[in-house]
A protein has these predicted regions:
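Bacterial Sec-dependent N-terminal signal peptides
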Residues: 1-21
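Catalytic-core signature of thiol
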Residues: 20-120
Length: 120
């Protein structure tokens, strides 16, 4: 038993005594990105993620930095879903959440709005 404890103590001492070096990251490619936005406690992650992707793509393509309104997209998506629910006589989906391509549907059919104009 003493041999096991002594061996364990020596192993722990050896591990602690090994040279510690600090790894430094190097930037291989730096991609521009828009600031992080807070969706609070809304079920709109689908919209925030997709709009963030579109903003990042605009930056990547050299089109400039945009801050697009996520809540404008959400509002128009819910209006469409309410109309759908009415046409289905109450059997449509009007709960939180949606899918990413609804952002492109709103973009194609209604358009997009800057955050400073429509902050929701």
């Amino acid at each position: 038993m003493k041999k096991i404890l002594l061996t364990a103590a020596l192993l722990c001492a050896c591990v602690g005594a090994s040279a510690q070096y600090k790894y430094e990251f190097t930037d291989v490619k730096v991609n521009a990105a828009t600031p992080v936005k807070n969706q609070a406690s809304t079920g709109t992650c689908w919209c925030f993620a997709t709009v963030s992707f579109l903003e990042s793509e605009l930056l990547r393509m050299g089109k400039g930095e945009y801050d697009l309104s996520e809540m404008f997209v959400v509002r128009n998506n819910y209006i469409r879903r309410m109309n759908d629910n009415y046409l289905r006589r109450g059997r449509g989906n009007v709960s939180q959440g949606s899918i990413a391509h609804m952002v492109t549907w709103v973009m194609d059919n209604v358009g997009l709005m800057p955050e400073e104009v429509y902050d929701g």
